[in-house]
């Protein structure tokens, strides 16, 4: 069975770019080396559901690659189903696990395999008058409810507490449909998923850490991997080579990373700037550089091509071990 890459797991990374020579004021200029078909970028807005948006974007690109046509799949169907399972897990551990709106790519593939999927038009996932997701209130309400159940020192739970949690997500996201009509055909979420021809078991997760043996599967120890999904552990250079090979052969890759890193921007740029050399090369004297806010430093370091850190296996591991990424 051929396997496709699903995710490259959380950690430090460097993104090599084919940048043309440009004056500093011109910012980044890229040469397209390889372009694989994708669907339009969707806006998660004020929701911590990047994992659902990005993975379904990957699935949509796979459908294009397989000649299935263009689809817009419902992110909030996945969020709804995932948070029901996560709530049940949280209560089973008496609150000594993670219940948060974050997630992993494995959650999406698990949902497709076990619950199916629906088109976006069938479940837009916004029941409160906005056009884009705003989950501040939803997250607060769901957290308060589930903690009252999991940590409420109740002698016995009622048989309906799961319905209460489900009703919260029904209220904000809409109910997950049991059946629906799409382009003149009747489906359930499961039969619609089957019609797409995407088999979640055909996709694998890759990562690269030294605290587990290479060439074995490992559970990445982060809170959002609460389902304990496994990833194949490869040496860093092999890990990157596999990704390059996939892209060059027409596959897209879903990459899980840390948006708190200095080199992450919301402009489609991700770099690993060398802060010390960057300050020197942008002409900033020490007084000015030290006077910049963290946000200003970040903007300056990611606004134009600058020297980048070459990330090693050891650097990646140290950052992970120290909660830096």
Describe the residue ranges of each PLM region.
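Bacterial Sec-dependent N-terminal signal peptides
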Residues: 1-22
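Catalytic-core signature of thiol
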Residues: 21-325
């Amino acid at each position: 069975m051929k396997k496709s890459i699903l995710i490259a797991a959380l950690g430090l990374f460097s993104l090599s770019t084919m940048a043309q020579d440009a004056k500093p004021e011109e910012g980044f200029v890229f040469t397209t080396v390889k372009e694989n078909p994708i669907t339009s970028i969707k806006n998660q807005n004020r929701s911590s559901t990047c994992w659902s948006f990005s993975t379904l974007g990957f699935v949509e690109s796979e459908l294009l690659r397989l000649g299935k046509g263009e689809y817009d799949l419902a992110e909030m169907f996945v969020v709804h189903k995932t948070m029901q399972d996560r709530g049940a897990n949280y209560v089973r551990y008496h609150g000594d696990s993670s219940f948060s709106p974050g997630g992993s790519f494995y959650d999406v593939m698990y949902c497709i395999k076990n619950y199916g999927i629906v088109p976006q038009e069938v479940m837009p996932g916004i029941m409160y008058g906005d056009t884009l997701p705003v989950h501040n209130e939803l997250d607060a309400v769901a957290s308060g409810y589930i903690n009252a159940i999991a940590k409420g020192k109740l002698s016995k739970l009622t048989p309906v507490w799961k319905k209460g949690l489900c009703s919260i997500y029904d209220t904000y996201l809409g109910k997950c449909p049991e059946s629906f009509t799409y382009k003149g055909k009747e489906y359930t979420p499961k039969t619609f998923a089957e019609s797409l021809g995407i088999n979640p078991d055909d996709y694998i997760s890759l990562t690269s850490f030294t605290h587990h043996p290479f060439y074995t599967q490992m559970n990445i120890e982060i809170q959002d991997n609460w389902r304990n999904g496994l990833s194949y552990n490869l040496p860093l250079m092999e890990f990157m080579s596999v990704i390059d090979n996939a892209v060059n052969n027409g596959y897209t890759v879903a990459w899980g990373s840390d948006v708190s890193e200095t080199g992450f921007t919301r402009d489609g740029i991700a770099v690993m700037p060398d802060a010390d050399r960057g300050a020197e090369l942008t002409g900033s004297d020490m007084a000015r550089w030290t006077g910049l806010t963290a946000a200003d430093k970040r903007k300056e370091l990611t606004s134009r091509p600058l020297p980048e850190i070459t990330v090693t296996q050891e650097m990646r591991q140290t950052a992970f071990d120290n909660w830096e990424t």
